């Protein structure tokens, strides 16, 4: 009886696997659905619904699969030959989820984006970042007790191999924080390069931080160990105390809400930095009343129709590019009225006002680290 039951289980498993193989064969005839980086150059099948002629990924809001995603997974491509083997994998390539080691970061300068991203290319895309495009953005979680999982807390920015900067209010009442580096799409584990999860050993809030009315909303997360820099994990540069960004269009990233739903793929919004007087006027008309004045330590960005950061984006960076192409951390998402919109800018921590405080803690922690800063 036991032998018969064992045979039935084996048969069912074989049938399921065969069904999966047949389904994949129909989607990707003569090939395998694999991660793009496992497919040798030039071996994309190029006669299926035009999808592989462009070697671009179709992606819409909410990660819907469009008509050109023949593998039913936007991170997979139809590859006409067996994929390139990895050093540790001997599995059937169609079933392999092996990650490859990312190339080391040969450019040790801070503030260097991967323009256009790595590996993938999202098409028809205006508000999502490319994979590893902004390697300093950090996904911060709070671990659940008696569980290996965690809840998303906020965004952060890598400024040093042991330091992440974020907003103070997002850390209020939070314990067991973990900083995740190299995150992009929170709905999948099929990203090509491995993430690094590192415990937060200490949270250092600005000594003058006040929640209500909010002031000096900045905090440092000291990591339990150094993050390992790679092509998809690199720090951003800090600004100079005298830097001003009014009139520039800068980039903000995060996984906050969009149309009421938290984003899976890291967002990318390009926003104008607005002068203090203009921002104060806009916020007064937006509902804060005729006597409101923007406090020192904040700057404003946005104020455009249907483009702004939202709930869940707190702590995320506002990065501005210098003439040389280097990015500096101009702001940190702090607060706003609703999710912003036309004539309702978002409010960010003005990082240039806190550079001295940040540098003092870098010295106090004996964490001196030199970069080739291209200004």
Q: At which residue positions do the language-model features occur?
A:
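Beta-propeller and closely related beta-sheet repeat lectin domains
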Residues: 154-155, 168, 315-317
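Classical eukaryotic N-terminal signal peptides for Sec-dependent ER targeting/secretion
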Residues: 1-10
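Short, structured beta-strand segments at or near domain termini in extracellular proteins/domains
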Residues: 75-80, 219-222, 351-361
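Conserved H-D interstitial segment of serine endopeptidase catalytic domains
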Residues: 112-116, 136, 140-143, 164-167, ...
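Extracellular trypsin-like serine protease catalytic domains
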Residues: 42, 49, 53-63, 137-149, ...
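Protease-domain processing segments flanking chymotrypsin-fold serine proteases, especially trypsin-like
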Residues: 13-165, 178, 183, 369-375
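Gly/Ser-enriched beta-turn/beta-hairpin loop segments
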Residues: 128, 132, 189-194, 210-215, ...
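Active-site substrate-binding loop(s) of clan PA
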Residues: 192, 204-210, 226-270
């Amino acid at each position: 009886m036991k032998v018969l039951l064992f045979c039935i289980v084996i048969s069912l498993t074989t049938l399921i696997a065969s069904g999966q193989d047949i389904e994949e064969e129909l989607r990707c005839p003569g090939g395998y659905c694999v991660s793009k980086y496992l497919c040798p150059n030039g071996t994309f099948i190029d006669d299926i619904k035009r999808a592989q002629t462009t070697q671009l990924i179709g992606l819409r809001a909410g990660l819907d699969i469009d008509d050109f995603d023949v593998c039913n997974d936007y991170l997979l491509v139809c590859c006409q030959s067996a994929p390139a083997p990895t050093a540790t994998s001997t599995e059937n390539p169609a079933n392999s989820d092996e990650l490859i080691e990312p190339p080391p970061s040969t450019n040790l300068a801070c503030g260097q984006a991967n323009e256009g991203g790595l590996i993938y290319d999202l098409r028809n895309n205006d508000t999502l970042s490319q994979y590893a495009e902004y390697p300093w953005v950090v996904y911060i979680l709070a671990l659940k007790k008696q569980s290996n999982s965690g809840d998303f807390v906020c965004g952060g920015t890598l400024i040093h191999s042991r330091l992440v900067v974020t907003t103070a209010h997002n850390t209020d009442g939070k314990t067991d924080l973990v900083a995740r580096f190299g995150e992009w799409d929170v709905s999948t584990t099929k990203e090509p390069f491995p993430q690094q999860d590192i415990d937060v050993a200490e949270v250092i809030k600005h000594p003058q931080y006040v929640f209500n009315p909010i002031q000096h909303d900045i905090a440092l997360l000291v990591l339990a160990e150094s993050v390992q820099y790679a092509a998809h994990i690199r720090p951003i540069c800090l600004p100079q105390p005298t830097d001003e960004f009014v009139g520039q269009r800068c980039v903000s990233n995060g996984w906050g809400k969009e149309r009421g739903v938290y984003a899976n793929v890291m967002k990318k919004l390009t926003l104008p930095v607005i002068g203090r007087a203009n921002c104060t006027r806009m916020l007064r008309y937006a509902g804060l009343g005729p006597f409101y004045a923007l406090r020192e330590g904040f700057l404003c960005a946005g104020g455009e129709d249907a483009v702004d950061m939202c709930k869940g984006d707190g702590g995320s960076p506002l990065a501005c590019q210098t003439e040389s192409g280097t990015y500096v951390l101009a702001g940190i998402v702090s607060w706003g009225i609703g999710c912003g919109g036309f004539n309702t800018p978002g409010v960010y921590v003005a990082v240039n006002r806190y550079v001295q405080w940040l540098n003092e803690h870098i010295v106090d922690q004996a964490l001196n680290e030199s970069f080739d800063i291209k200004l």
